[in-house]
Swiss-Prot record:
Region Disordered, annotated ranges: 53-78, 113-134, 190-232, 268-361
Posttranslational modification: Ubiquitinated. Targeted for degradation by the SCF(COI1) E3 ubiquitin ligase-proteasome pathway during jasmonate signaling.
Domain Tify positions: 232-267
Identification of the protein by name: Protein TIFY 8
GO cellular component, one term: nucleus
Originating species: Arabidopsis thaliana (Mouse-ear cress)
Length: 361
């Protein structure tokens, strides 16, 4: 009986195919990939059949065959009515107008819904079959310029979807581009912070690269080297501690914390301070140490420097054009054992003093 019934419906199939070819001329682009001649022809035939013959005709369609094998569901007429009611009963699917009756839209949605994948009703609207036009969109996104080629590759292996996946792709591409723009400054700051600790050099090599051009003498910076380190010194507050032939770099050190660290390190010879003032102090201050700004003491003692051990030597060095302050504290015969350098961001008036050793010679 089923064969005779199908033989009697051949003229309607031919008529539906002719109407389908006429509708194909009106469609410019099928972005959702729902255009399928077999499903469209059967859906058109179902639309022309009376309601009594719809259940018998739907039993022979591939969509219901896959539905019965997947979950053993009933006929297509009741479920298609539910989908039509859920979608609003119109011919518009997410802003894209589809030419044809409602059964075309419902048939394509139901065939994808009962193909074996469990999806919700909201997700089934975006689910379509693999169509050459959707593959063309994925190829365009994959071969696009710049950042389009980074996050499209893992998503290209998934089944293509409609506008929901394209919006999801654009959202991920915008976030990845924002991350790429923020990678640059953080990498530069990290390399600047780890420049001394990553090299692992020992001896006066690290000391000369950070503090002075000549590694044999401890003296102030030359004016030629201030231009190269101006940007590095003004961008961050760094403290470099040389101990045991290794350099340890610390970023964003507060001046008060640097004073405490330098006071603890110089407990045998007095306290050291990294702060600069516009006017030199006229009286001795026990908290900041018995030093005057811009002066250098080598051995012996004076009225202004009581209780100064003769073997200790302190040399503050100032850059004439840079905003950073560097002080080097060593002991005779122990130039390579330990030293502390503090770099600040404060812009103060530099003080220029001559070296007593150079004046004596």
């Amino acid at each position: 009986m089923m064969v005779n019934h199908n033989n009697g419906q051949r003229p309607t199939d031919i008529d539906s195919r002719l109407r389908q070819t006429e509708q194909d001329k009106l469609l410019f682009h099928d972005f959702l990939g729902s255009k399928n001649p077999t499903l469209a022809s059967t859906s058109m035939a179902d639309h022309r059949l009376p309601p009594d013959n719809k259940a018998a005709k739907a039993a022979m369609t591939p969509s219901t065959a896959s539905a019965s094998s997947a979950g053993g569901l009933g006929g297509l007429s009741s479920t298609s009515d539910l989908v039509e009611r859920h979608s609003g009963g119109g011919n518009h699917l997410d802003g894209i107008q589809l030419f044809g009756p409602r059964s075309d839209v419902s048939g394509s949605i139901m065939s994808n819904r009962f193909s074996g994948n469990k999806r919700s009703n909201s997700d089934s609207h975006f689910t379509t079959q693999e169509h050459p036009e959707t593959l063309h969109w994925s190829k365009l996104l994959r071969n696009g310029p710049g950042s389009f080629s980074m996050n499209v590759n893992p998503l290209a292996n998934q089944p293509p979807r409609g506008g929901g996946q394209i919006s999801h792709l654009l959202h991920q591409l915008s976030t990845s581009r924002f991350k790429d723009e923020n990678v640059g400054p953080s990498v530069i700051a990290q390399t600047a912070a780890d420049e001394g600790s990553r090299t692992g050099m020992k001896g006066p090599g690290i000391l000369s690269s950070f503090t002075m051009p000549n590694s044999s003498k401890l003296e102030s910076f030359a004016p030629s080297n201030t231009g190269n380190r101006k940007d590095l010194a003004s961008s961050t507050k760094q403290m470099t501690i040389f101990y045991g032939g290794q350099a340890h770099v610390f970023d964003d050190v507060h001046p008060n914390k640097a004073d405490v660290i330098m006071a603890l390190a110089g407990s045998s010879g007095g306290s050291w301070s990294t702060g600069l003032s516009h006017k030199p102090k006229s009286k001795n201050n026990t908290s900041d140490g018995p030093y005057k700004l811009g002066q250098m003491y080598e051995g012996g003692s004076s009225k202004e420097t009581p209780q100064m051990p003769p073997e200790f030597r302190a040399r503050p060095s100032h850059q004439p054009t840079s905003s950073a302050c560097h002080r080097i504290f060593t002991q005779p015969g122990r130039e390579h054992q330990g030293s502390i350098i503090s770099r600040g961001r404060d812009i103060r008036d530099p003080v220029h003093r001559s070296d007593p050793e150079k004046e004596a010679t």
